Swiss-Prot record:
Pfam families: Lig_chan, Lig_chan-Glu_bd. It is found in: Cell membrane; Postsynaptic cell membrane. Residues 18-162, 250-413 are extracellular. SMART domains: Lig_chan-Glu_bd, PBPe. Its main location: membrane. This is Probable glutamate receptor. One of its GO terms (molecular function) is ligand-gated monoatomic ion channel activity. Keywords: Cell membrane, Glycoprotein, Ion channel, Ion transport, Ligand-gated ion channel, Membrane, Postsynaptic cell membrane, Receptor, Signal, Synapse, Transmembrane, Transmembrane helix, Transport. Residues 477-487 have a biased composition (Polar residues). Residues 464-487 are annotated as: Disordered. SUPFAM superfamilies: Periplasmic binding protein-like II.
Amino acid sequence: MEKALMLFLAVSLLSLGHTDGKENAETLLKERTKRQIPKTLTVTTILEKPFAMKTESDALEGYAIDLLSELTQSLGFNYTLHIVKDGKYGSKDQEGNWSGMVGEIIRKEADLAIAPLTITSVRENAISFTKPFMQTGIGILLKKDTAAESSYMFGFLNPFSKELWIGIIISYVITSLCLFLVGRLSPCEWTEPASEQNQFTLLNSLWYGVGALTLQGAEPQPKALSARIIAVIWWVFSITLLAAYIGSFASYINSNTNQTPNIQSVEDLLKQDKLDFGTLSNSSTLNFFKNSKNPTFQMIYEYMDKRKDRVLVKTFSEGVQRVRESNYAFLGESISQDFVVAKHCDLIRAPEMIGGRGYGIAAELDSPLIRPLTIAILELFESGKLEYLRQKWWENTCSTQDQTGWVPVQPHTLGGIFLILGIGLALGLIVSFMELMCKSRSNAEQQKKSCCSAFSEEIAQRFGKTQNQEGLEKKSPTSNSCDEVKA
């Protein structure tokens, strides 16, 4: 018993020592990391909403400023912050000299650059970056009234999506064919005088479907139960469809249709001639199009390069202003565009985003600061702090109506009525076959034939040539064909 107790105490002490050792190792690692970072760092940034903005007292606030504060708490360093002197992010000229924040890092005028600075291969050759603290891409910023500019000649088709229109046309054709088949199969539809053919010809069936869609009664009127089932189901389908169309069309006219831009992608920019489009001069966005092997992106760059004096802007704010005041589309960082869209309800960003990239904190090449900063950024990401800062600075101030917008009716919205129509058509066809089988059995008893033989004869006569149809009309009594089926 004493040995067992001593063994238990020994294991407990070893476990405690292991835990303490692990905690001490983590503490030592943090202390070692802090010792690698100078007590005071010089940080450069750029005035870019919402990353860094001046308050009324000329102090700086924004996402980048809050991120810097979180890093100082985590790594225990002080900093002096200044705005980049030339107001640029950083690009290399023909002589190999760097401008902007990248240039300040290289010239050791700053230890860190915390801003929406895109991580690119060219910059990575000159400076070092941490892991991205935010992901972004290239978006298209548009003014709503120009974004939604489209052909109003066919605007009446907009309440329904293309897929729904295709479904309606297919349903109309199938219903007309079913009505035509029922008119041929059902004996009750062959009660006309011998001089007339069956009333539900293919043309009449198509016309009847159109009449129901426009809520206008159309001749001929169905007499057989099977034909009436199909007619009733089609009328229910038509009324539901028209109600949905009228409601969607009213919403389309009265709502802000600019929420669904006609410019969806960079390809759409090339296909139109009403909007100029450009980006920041000497920016990573411009270099992306310049260095891309994609033919479409090359055409985008050629367009901007030929008109660079007219379409390239010096600052992001200038690009936003041009979008709001003229027919201009601005290509730039999607994350910054999302911010201005959240604050200016007359702007919208096109759905497509290309050239995914990230924002990172920059330091001099092979700087020992990169690793501890990267670890701190990952810890902030895992704790949800970065997402909190994102929600804080990208808060949408537009009304709910501005955010919701209008969208066309999709097939899944009316899926139930399509299902009911399909069931009704199947039921109508089944009933018409039952009507014909009843008539065939009656003829078989009168003519002393087998039911199968009489049924085959009826089918052949109904889908034969005109002379066979006339023979059927003369052969079938005009007064009691439906009565026989009902009996």
